[in-house]
Amino acid sequence: MAGTALKRLMAEYKQLTLNPPEGIVAGPMNEENFFEWEALIMGPEDTCFEFGVFPAILSFPLDYPLSPPKMRFTCEMFHPNIYPDGRVCISILHAPGDDPMGYESSAERWSPVQSVEKILLSVVSMLAEPNDESGANVDASKMWRDDREQFYKVAKQIVQKSLGL
């Protein structure tokens, strides 16, 4: 199974290298291990995360693409759909099948036709438009709902930290 996963990851890396999505850089951390990738995601334009540069790690299972990777930001993040430890909570990264909580349709969840590029683009969209109905960070979700101005201030501080300011 790992051979199939490796071939798929190599093909996806080649595609990302030849035609990278705007504002995203991603690839294996080293040539010996194609199952751990690092990514740099630029904050989406016209959002409170604009100008930020956010590093993340994608960890792929040996049965990829049957199972989704896990994604974790390695910098400080404050967002309704990112756990305090950096783990990303987004439908496309959830295993196939029905959502026991009833928030997601099976079509929104992982399937083998998804790709690293689709994951990263979904995360950029998530940064721009948080889903506060299934919050991974309760404090960020509450602030997003109740005090948007304060949320923007905190996000701007995160952006400055991401730039080393």
From Swiss-Prot:
- UniProt EC number: 2.3.2.23
**Which segments of the protein form a coiled coil according to its record?**
none
- Pathway field: Protein modification; protein ubiquitination
> What GO biological process, any one, is recorded here?
ubiquitin-dependent protein catabolic process
Active-site residues annotated for this sequence: 89
InterPro entries per UniProt: Ub_conjugating_enzyme, UBQ-conjugat_E2_core, UBQ-conjugating_AS, UBQ-conjugating_enzyme/RWD
Looking at the UniProt record for this protein, which Gene Ontology cellular component terms does it annotate, in alphabetical order? cytosol; endoplasmic reticulum; lipid droplet
Which keywords accompany this UniProt record? Acetylation, ATP-binding, Endoplasmic reticulum, Lipid droplet, Nucleotide-binding, Transferase, Ubl conjugation pathway
Query: What Gene Ontology molecular-function terms does this entry list?
Result: ATP binding; ubiquitin conjugating enzyme activity; ubiquitin-protein transferase activity
**Signal peptide from the UniProt entry:** none
Q: Tell me yes or no: is Ribosomal protein among this UniProt entry's keywords.
A: no
Q: Which Pfam families match?
A: UQ_con
Where does the UniProt annotation locate this protein? Answer: Endoplasmic reticulum; Lipid droplet
The record's CDD domains line, in alphabetical order, gives:
UBCc_UBE2G2
Q: Which residues carry this modification: N-acetylalanine?
A: 2
Q: How does it assemble?
A: Interacts with AUP1 (via C-terminus); the interaction recruits UBE2G2 to lipid droplets. Interacts with ubiquitin ligases AMFR/gp78 and RNF139/TRC8; recruitment to lipid droplets by AUP1 facilitates interaction of UBE2G2 with AMFR and RNF139, leading to sterol-induced ubiquitination of 3-hydroxy-3-methylglutaryl coenzyme A reductase and its subsequent proteasomal degradation.
State the family named in the UniProt similarity comment for this chain: Belongs to the ubiquitin-conjugating enzyme family.
Its biological purpose is as follows: Accepts ubiquitin from the E1 complex and catalyzes its covalent attachment to other proteins. In vitro catalyzes 'Lys-48'-linked polyubiquitination. Involved in endoplasmic reticulum-associated degradation (ERAD). Required for sterol-induced ubiquitination of 3-hydroxy-3-methylglutaryl coenzyme A reductase and its subsequent proteasomal degradation.
Q: Under which name does UniProt file this protein? A: Ubiquitin-conjugating enzyme E2 G2
The organism named in the record is Bos taurus (Bovine)
